[in-house]
């Protein structure tokens, strides 16, 4: 079944609202692109308004991790998702979202962008104590 972002056909009281027009294509939605840690990087393309193509990351292998102390940004391999405050389900299944804490080759990092909406994973290096507290 498709995702539809149009107005509900029911009033708060439960009564029916008679639609004045049919559903339109621009009211359509998409299920979320749940970015996972994978063996090979894979993108998911969606059609946007005006024929625009939106690219989201389906499987991620590497992340651009910034070190706030030195200011350096390194492209490092993602090992696993340690914590995801967005959802227990996402944490259990290893889904990467904004705010998720991932383990990389150089340490723990917090994701700062939305990989389901952008084709990269950007993160900031955090100390081990910050994650536990």
Curated annotation (Swiss-Prot):
GO cellular component, one term: ribonucleoprotein complex
Record-linked CDD domains: Ribosomal_S8e
Source superkingdom: Archaea
GO biological process, one term: translation
A Pfam family of this chain: Ribosomal_S8e
GO molecular function, one term: structural constituent of ribosome
The keyword Transcription regulation belongs to this UniProt entry's keyword annotation: no
UniProt keyword Membrane, yes or no: no
Subunit structure: Part of the 30S ribosomal subunit.
Name the UniProt record assigns to this protein: Small ribosomal subunit protein eS8
Gene symbol of the encoding locus: rps8e
């Amino acid at each position: 079944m498709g995702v539809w972002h149009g107005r509900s056909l029911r009033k708060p009281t439960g009564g029916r609202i008679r639609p004045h027009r049919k559903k339109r294509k621009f009211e359509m939605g998409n299920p979320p692109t749940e970015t996972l840690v994978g063996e090979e990087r894979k993108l998911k393309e969606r059609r946007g308004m005006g024929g625009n193509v939106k690219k989201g990351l389906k499987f991620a292998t590497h992340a651009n991790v910034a070190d706030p102390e030195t200011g350096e940004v390194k492209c490092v391999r993602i090992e696993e998702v340690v914590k995801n405050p967005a959802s227990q389900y996402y944490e259990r299944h290893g889904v990467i979202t904004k705010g998720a804490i991932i383990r990389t080759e150089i340490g723990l990092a917090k994701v700062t962008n939305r990989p389901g909406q952008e084709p990269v994973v950007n993160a900031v290096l955090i100390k081990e104590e910050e994650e536990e507290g």
